Amino acid sequence: MKGKFSEFYSSLPNINISDIDNLTLIFDTNIFMYLYLFDEKRQDAFFYNMKQKGFKVFIPYNVGLEYQINRDFQIKNKDVVKQRIDNAFLSIDKVMDETLAAISSFNNNKLKGLIDNINKLKSEISNSTNCFVSDNFDNFKCSNNQDYFDDSIRRRIDDLVHDVGEPYDPKKLEEIYKNGEDRFLKKIPPGFRDSKKGDECYYHDGVEYIKKYGDLIIWMQVLDYLKNCNDGEFVLFVTNDLKSDFWKNINNYKIPHPYLKKEAKSINAEIEFDMMTADEFFNQVMISDLDSNSTEAQNTKDEIKETINVVLSPYESLQERAEQYDRLFSYDDDEMNDRY
């Protein structure tokens, strides 16, 4: 039965990617974006281990384009996340101050002892939270001071990526948009969860890219790459787009949408194709040279989980850009009536 329904099977939960022969990694844009949120130590571990393992890396053209467009936003966004962390803890002081003001307004001497106790509690909480923030989040800002022209992460990404796909011309994009309308109506993945984006678009090099088809464009470029893969090659698509048009949620464990694996297999039946989420991938790469039971390995796993779960919701001057490119960090566990 496995031969007929291979799209429902995966060996990845029991295999370390370092043990896969003839492996090619294809990264979605969000994988590069998350690198900016790790501290310098984790960044170094990622790039060092990727080089040591000799992984072959390919990215579709539109992954590279989205990364270049959003890179400056991500550098700014790291500071925004740190500011949100600071504001969250400052809100504790605000609540305590409001409580004290409300109690003091009664002007009752009997409440003096209570007010003194609240002030003492406020001081203790403030000291405790300040120490916690200092120990855990002070280095959360861009530790290596990336700026637009001096970006160490981009330099290492440039060195890491072996191959970048070619762009689609306007005629090819029009075909994808037309085909995309039909796929979206039939809930064929990927991208139908982005149909609500309407006809918003952006331009690059004189070419119009419609936002709601962003995932589909990248997927078509992945399929184009698969056409020319060698027999026996194992291609792993790594993405943290967790919407239900990429993954199916089974008991809190995400498995690749069977339709995507089936479509990949229909393009090239002589290769192995699978998908992996960002947290699984970063865990395997960043701790590959550590004792899996060590404190350092556990600390790395914890930081990966915290970083992946950071909800990036920029505001003020960054809000417009966030809305324009919100596909980069999209989460959606709501299962729909897919084709499977």
Task: Describe every region a protein language model picked out.
Residues 2-235, 243-339:
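Active-site-proximal, substrate-binding regions of enzyme catalytic domains
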Residues 239:
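Short beta-strand/turn micro-motifs composed of small residues
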